[in-house]
Amino acid sequence: MNSTSSQTVNLVADIGGTNIRLAICHADNSIEKIETYQCANYSSLLEVIQYYIAQQSLKDKSINACLAIACPVDTGFISMTNLPWQFSQKELKQQLGLNSLSLINAYTAIAMAIPLLNDQQKVKIGQGEAITNKPIAVCGPGTGLGVANLIPVNDQWHCISGEGGHIDFAAVDELDIEILQYLKTLKKRVSFEQVLSGYGLEQIYQALVHINQAKKAQS
């Protein structure tokens, strides 16, 4: 993003299906004025950003914005996966009076931040040691399931983002199969996102309750 001055502001946002986080980013990558809002309390992304701009007294500033969004962003028209929000990149820029507006996939943003982490910001899981300058897989459950890959090319990192959470859930044992069979009574197609996410935990719980009740009834 462009560097900040007294009249220029870099606005950044992390937009998920449950929460939206807005902040001001400076040229040294430091951020301030971080605010979190619940998406369900607003009718549109425009409404949330307008509120933040008013609260932070930014109306008279020249604003460059970069929004990380939990859905595909390559068409210029955004239809969020886990939220009933739709908008045009061009129209949003005009409505907010922005100097510039960039949209990136939320897991592209997360993946590109991985090389910036220091050892104190990392937690080791499992055995073995990390190999430097090798591809990095990024995966995280939230409202949905986000995935991305980070590939080193010519001393730079390139991100390959996708919608991996939408691939079919593959059952591997008897309990998995029982859970899958229950979830298929709710939806014709069951993706990994439906078991590995915030609402996925709820669905697994519901499935286990159903399975246990059915077994008790048969005993």
Question: Where in this protein do the model-derived segments appear?
Answer:
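Glycine/GP-enriched mid-protein hinge/lid loop-to-helix segment characteristic of carbohydrate kinases
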Residues: 127-137, 145-219
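Short beta-strand scaffold segments in enzyme catalytic cores
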Residues: 20-24, 71, 138-139, 145-151
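A glycine- and small-aliphatic-rich helix-loop capping segment at beta-alpha/alpha-beta transitions
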Residues: 27-29, 83-86, 117-125, 152-160
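Residue-level signal for inorganic ion chemistry
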Residues: 22, 92, 201
